[in-house]
Structures are given as C-alpha cells and as structure tokens.
Amino acid sequence: MVYNNLLERFIKYVKVNTRSNPTSQTTPSTQSQVDFALQVLKPEMEAIGLEDVHYLEHNGYIVGTLPANAQHLTRKIGFISHMDTADFNAEGINPQVIDNYEGGNITLGQSGYLLKPDDFPQLNNYLGQTLVTTDGTTLLGADDKSGIAEIMTAIEFLVANPTIEHCEIRVAFGPDEEIGTGANKFDVEDFNVDFAYTVDGGPLGELQYETFSAAGLDVQFLGRNVHPGTAKGQMINALQLAIDFHNQLPETDRPEKTDGYQGFYHLLDLSGTVEEASSSYIIRDFEDDSFKSRKAFIEQLAQKMNDELGENRVVISLQDQYYNMKKVIEKDMTPVNLAKEVMEDLDIKPIIEPIRGGTDGSKISFMGIPTPNIFAGGENMHGRFEFVSLETMEKAVDVILGIVQKP
C-alpha cells in the first residue's frame, strides 16, 4: 500500500544527526538522541494519536501506546526501533531520491562515488522502485530510521482508519543500539507487552529470531623497552607480543572469511609502543558450546604466552555482551509464526535466517519479552553506499498492520 507521509517522514528523521558515541559514559551516549526523542519524535507521536507518550530518562527510550479497539484482540504487542546511527559520518545527511530506478550506476551527489550494481548486485532487485541513497559524504541512517518511520506510519494509518480492528500496540524508540548498550536498561515493566518486534532488519522478507552470542575482548601487552642496540635477550616488544597473539588465532575465523552459522574473532583495534600495547576484539558465535570454546581458547592462548615468557605480560579482559535470543524465542514461536503468516498473506516470502549480528531484541528477549526482528528495508548499512527502497518500507508498514490485526 502507498502511505503518503512515509517518505517525507523518513527523510525528516535521517537529516537529524543521531550518531552514538562508544566512548561516552552516559545513556543516551549523545545529546542529539535526547533532542531527537523530545523535539522530533515526542510531539509527532502525540500528534498522530499515541497515548501515554513519555520519555524515560533512566534509559533514553520514548514510549507510547495505541489502545486496542476490539475486545477479541487481547494481545499486547510492541514494536521497537533505535534512534542512533552507526560509527560513520552523520553530519549533513542529504538524501537523494531516485524515482523509478532503471538500473545502472547511481551518482552519489558531487562526492565522486558511484553506487554500482557491479559492486552491489542487490541493486538489480529494485528496478522500477523508488530508492533513497546518500550523497556519498555520509551514511543514510535507514538503520534504523526506516524502522521508526514505518512504525509511526502504521500508527498514523490505524488512527486515521478506526474501523480497522487491532490489538493494543506499544512502541518504543531507544538509543545506542549501534554501540551495544541501548537495551541494557530497557524497562520491561513499563513496556508491558506479551511480545515485541524490533523493526531493524534489512531487505524485504527478513524475519530473524537467531542472533550471535557476543563477547568483547581487550588485551593488554606489557613489554620491556631497552636501547635496540643492546636489546638482545633483554627487550620484550609489546607490539610484537600483540602480533604474535593475533597470529595464533585461527586465520579462517575472521568476518571476511565466514558466513552462515560460522563464528569469528574480529580485531577492531591494535595500538601501542614497545613498552605497552593493546588490542580489542569482538568474539561471535551462535551455539553455546562453540561460543564458550572460543572464549576458552583465548584464555588458554594468553596462559600459553605467559608461560613461555615466564611472567604475566599478556593480560586479557573478556566481557559477555549479549546472547543468542533463539534460546528464549524457540520456547514459544508465536511471534515468529505470526509474522511469517502475515508475510505470506501479503505474498512476501519470509527469509528466516540467523542475524550475523545482534539487535536490541537479543537483550530484551532475555529480560522476558520475546522480540524477533523484522525487515525495515535498509541495504549496505553503516556507510556511504547505504540505500533503502520506498516500496520495501511500505511493505514493512503492511506487515506491522497485519500483525496487530491477527487474533
């Protein structure tokens, strides 16, 4: 279905810089997210007919309710999207709208960059559709402002069409998903639903209830610096220790060499001097046993290197970040089956695959609200080649509307 305000709403949202900050100690991590919630979303949520719209200062979520209008629809269903965008330039976002995409390269503003089917063959799936792209200097922010726009548009449509019967709907727009902390303080009691969906997926038909289990790893390497001219048998180069550590990780277990259900170790940062160095990794896997094995391997590697050095010069810090929500959701597949049924009713082929990442739904599911993920439309997210199809966004609205009407 065509929704008149969807494109305008989406463009308005993405023009606001809501980039999160991984080094911040506050929640939300940036003031721009607070301003977006209070100055943009809150008045609009109230204007389209949501009730009890309130901002939770302790966690940065803006929440609202659309009461049920049919006694026989007794479920309470939530829809969640995140306000922040990823770690890429988000200042001065200037979206381009390509009507009736005919194929071929898309020039991204005056940046000199091209969005090319040779590089991104999925572009060929969107012939004849309306695409929104960047101008090549920023990301777009479809992750996840497409989700916010879709949820808002669905609510607006229901309020404007009161003869459409629906269950109670609660919506929540939150901070800091991209830096992995947004759902840490999610208020389950305040949200009070039977189950929920994050509208944070990619292409048409995505329906996901499996995520990685995730850990963060920080490693400190303690060296000993002496003059290189007299270093034999005395110098311990901390940077060399970091290199040796990394080279003992399985070469095939890297993001660029894995897919499907394969896990990995991913080096994010390595810096230092001869005297002291540090590296940061993320560790990902799907199954409990293999996730535990990866962490155990790290501990054993550090111990092995320290034994060889004769002292503790490799110091590790491992922190679990989130877990595969399949463990929770498979106990009651109602939200997955409901979304699947709605997609099939709309002639959308459900693509049920694991998320090679995480969503806020991972943590929220373990807090007691099963929260699978449905598509929002974004492609090539987190960079200058990001784009979204308006037609896919419209179908995401259709799915939301279908879910809340199901008995």
Curated annotation (Swiss-Prot):
EC no. given is 3.4.11.4
Any one GO MF term held by the record is: metallopeptidase activity
Enzymatic reactions:
Release of the N-terminal residue from a tripeptide
Keywords (alphabetical) are: Aminopeptidase, Cytoplasm, Hydrolase, Metal-binding, Metalloprotease, Protease, Zinc
Q: Summarize where Zn(2+) 2 binds, as residue positions.
A: 143, 178, 382
Enumerate the cofactors the protein uses.
Answer: Zn(2+)
- Major place of localization? cytoplasm
Comment on bound cofactor: Binds 2 Zn(2+) ions per subunit.
InterPro entries, alphabetized = ArgE/DapE_CS (IPR001261), Bact_exopeptidase_dim_dom (IPR036264), Peptidase_M20 (IPR002933), Peptidase_M20_dimer (IPR011650), Peptidase_M20B (IPR010161)
Binding residue positions for Zn(2+) 1: 82, 143, 200
Among the record's GO biological process terms, what is one? Answer: proteolysis
| Locations listed in the record | Cytoplasm
Q: Which GO terms describe its cellular component?
A: cytosol
| Protein's job | Cleaves the N-terminal amino acid of tripeptides.
**Alphabetical list of HAMAP family matching this protein:** Aminopeptidase_M20
Q: Which family does it belong to?
A: Belongs to the peptidase M20B family.
Q: Which NCBIfam families match?
A: peptidase-T (TIGR01882), PRK05469.1 (NF003976), PRK13381.1 (NF009920)
Record-given protein name: Peptidase T
Organism name: Streptococcus uberis (strain ATCC BAA-854 / 0140J)
